[in-house]
């Protein structure tokens, strides 16, 4: 299904997407190991014949497992230099000491990238500005721009786009049917604007 999605992405936004970072979840409920994810990624690379360059990273829930792996530097970072770390929180409440956790990530030499901040019910525009001033980068999800998660989340995503606060764009692909419905249809115009920034 991931392979189909990658082919679909090439068809939908041809010549604009040059590389894709695959970011499986790591959290206490899904305790993927770096070794397991690297093995599965090697299998994917062996099977994929498309023209998009593939990379492996992870989306890390800021929980106790993350704290443990951060301490051991057992991580799968983003970026050509391997110095960006994709992190997420609960949609409804931040972990205790969120800003301190983000500062610890920075102290380890990583740039924290907050996944889908537009979807966090506890965050608003002032929070985004504070985090940006701290050096936190943002990744928004394409379905948010398409309105898949509702108008409030779409407005927050569009605010982040207008502020040019976006470092990465995520597809949030968990199934090909979602990809077809939202990524290849209603999101295209807004994505084009974002890519042209």
Predicted regions and their residues:
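Short acidic/polar active-site loop segments enriched in Thr and Asp
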Residues: 18-19, 167
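Single conserved hydrophobic/aromatic residue that forms the stacking wall/gate
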Residues: 1-8, 13
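Conserved, mostly hydrophobic/aromatic
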Residues: 24, 116, 172
């Amino acid at each position: 299904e991931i392979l189909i999605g990658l082919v679909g992405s090439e068809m939908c936004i041809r010549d604009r997407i040059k590389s894709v970072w695959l970011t499986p979840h790591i959290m206490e409920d899904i305790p993927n190991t770096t070794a397991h994810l690297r093995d599965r990624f090697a299998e994917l690379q062996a099977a994929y014949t498309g023209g998009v360059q593939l990379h492996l990273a992870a989306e890390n829930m800021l929980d106790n497992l993350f704290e443990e792996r951060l301490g051991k530097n057992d991580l799968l970072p983003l970026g050509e230099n391997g110095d960006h770390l994709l992190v997420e929180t609960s949609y409804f409440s931040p972990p205790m000491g969120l800003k301190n956790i983000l500062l610890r990530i920075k102290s380890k030499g990583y740039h924290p990238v907050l996944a889908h901040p537009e979807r966090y019910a506890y965050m608003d525009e002032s929070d985004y500005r504070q985090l940006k001033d701290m050096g936190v980068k943002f990744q928004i999800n394409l379905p948010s721009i398409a309105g898949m998660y509702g108008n409030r989340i779409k407005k927050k995503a569009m605010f982040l786009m207008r502020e040019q606060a976006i470092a990465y764009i995520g597809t949030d692909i968990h199934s090909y049917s979602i990809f077809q419905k939202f990524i290849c249809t209603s999101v295209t115009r807004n994505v084009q604007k974002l890519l042209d920034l």
